[in-house]
Amino acid sequence: MIFLALGATEAIGASSHFLKIEDTGIILDAGADPEQDGPASIPEFDLIRKNPGWYVDHAIITHAHHDHMGALPLLIKSFPHVLVHMTRATRDLADLLLPASARLQRRKLKEGSAAFDPLFSEEELEAYSYLYMTHELEEEFDLSGVRSRVPVKGMFYNAGHVLGAAGVLLSSANGSRVFYTSDTSLRPQAIIPGGDYPDEPVDVLILESTLGADEEAE
């Protein structure tokens, strides 16, 4: 198993991680940094291409915040065969928010407040949408890679963060289990219940740590 953070290790923004499990390559989120513009705002997807034995089969988008999905079009440009998995609510929000991001980038360039061309267009987003696959919470779905001889499955769990947000459990037929919480909260909100997590133990836990060193949060 290989884990590589592609962005947002010490700051909020550009959350994205590469996980290689049983020869299946999976991207966990593809966020953009809201404090940056142009290429500096996206994760370092080139780190994957520099390794000939690595391949991106699937991507998981845990929720529709810019710092977790804003670079999804760039990920698809880099790896055109990737299948993108998310909840239905995240898909519905992505269909609204990503085109809005494309329009904002175009407007900032026109107004002279951006030094870079837009990273993607609304037309590109429409072309990429056939790669989106939606799943219900606690519904098992296939994540096996084209080079893997060992099946890998995924399952979403309510993350308790925003509408549609989900953590994901990754399980291989060899018995290894990885859980990625993404942004999560145990406490219920006005319209969002608190997060749910797998009952059985996992081998690897990838846990968000926002406010993790805050005394009040502890």
Question: What do these predicted regions represent?
Answer:
Residues 129-142:
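Short acidic-hydrophobic, aromatic-tinged amphipathic segments that line or gate anion-handling sites
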Residues 1-3, 21-25, 140-155, 172-178:
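Beta-strand-turn-beta hairpins that frame and shape the catalytic cleft
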Residues 81, 128-131, 151-153, 175:
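A generic structural signal for alpha->beta connector loops
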Residues 2-7, 26-29, 153-159, 177-183, ...:
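Active-site-proximal beta-strand elements of phosphoester/diester hydrolases
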Residues 14-19, 165-170:
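Short beta-strand scaffold segments in enzyme catalytic cores
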Residues 167, 185-218:
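Cap/insert and terminal regions of metallo-dependent hydrolase folds
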Residues 9-14, 21-82, 86-92, 97-128, ...:
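Pre-active-site segment of Zn-dependent metallo-hydrolases
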Residues 9-13, 148, 159-163:
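A short catalytic or substrate-binding loop motif that flags glycine-/basic-rich loops and adjacent residues
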